[in-house]
């Protein structure tokens, strides 16, 4: 077992909410380490939609998931957080008042005063369509997420699904692709009406195809797709020519070890009080999509707000004898000094 790393705060999850929490904690002189099961920083933003536009970040009309991640990393540079990627927290043990010993599946041990769970909905994996032999094509010509749009330039793409992800990527990839076919099991969609309207206009213009049915088999060799057999609503089978398939059937969310950390759970979410977003265990907080409370909105901006209030309470655990004086970055010379702006 590795020697324990001592830190003020350990954040579990390096998505946008976890990253902004570093900023709020750093302003209050708390040192932070972050652990994430993914191999990259940014959580779902980086893993699932790095190039997908986000429109509801205050003051930023449009930013991609990757762009938001990069901006947050730039913002927290002055606080020099340490990241531990490809590691999953397995256990949290109380060792003081306050104080916790946290152990990962890599054998790394942390000793900290505060734990912040910012793990989104837990670990996630795409739902795989029930198509025989699809595994042989995965990551070669079948993909469950778009990480680089340029990868799909001049491709003949079959997009499968009827939700927002399927419609969004149909519209976003349309200018790049050689041809796009959208396939859904029925001619009704669970996506934003504006997106559905745009898609139907492209179909009417003849620049893309819409088919109703389900994929029953794939055609190709050595992982390289040449087509997909589709069974229509009239039970007839046809072949859709494609060299790339993007199935968007949603995600399977798994809490994993979170369920064993002694935290109360409601429908796989962690209940918190809304003054500081603390859990039933003093010193353990939950922010972002992993938590629940009356009126909760699963928005990145909500997680930012939660992180700011969490940091105020965390300060009491890390510095129990130090009075916290609230300050503004616009007027506080000490905060500006921490940020390196004066």
From Swiss-Prot:
It is an enzyme of class 1 (oxidoreductase). PANTHER family: THIOREDOXIN REDUCTASE 1-RELATED-RELATED. One of its GO terms (molecular function) is NADP binding. It catalyses: 2 reduced [2Fe-2S]-[ferredoxin] + NADP(+) + H(+) = 2 oxidized [2Fe-2S]-[ferredoxin] + NADPH. Pfam families: Pyr_redox_2. Belongs to the ferredoxin--NADP reductase type 2 family. This is Ferredoxin--NADP reductase. FAD binds at residues 17, 36, 44, 49, 89, 124, 289, 330. The lineage of its organism: Bacteria, Pseudomonadati, Pseudomonadota, Alphaproteobacteria, Hyphomicrobiales. Transmembrane segments: none annotated. Its cofactor is FAD. Disulfide bonds: none annotated. Gene3D superfamilies: FAD/NAD(P)-binding domain. Homodimer. InterPro entries: FAD/NAD-bd_sf, FAD/NAD-binding_dom, Fd--NADP_Rdtase_type_2, Ferredoxin-NADP_redctase_2. Its EC number is 1.18.1.2. It comes from the Bacteria. Signal peptide: none annotated. Binds 1 FAD per subunit.
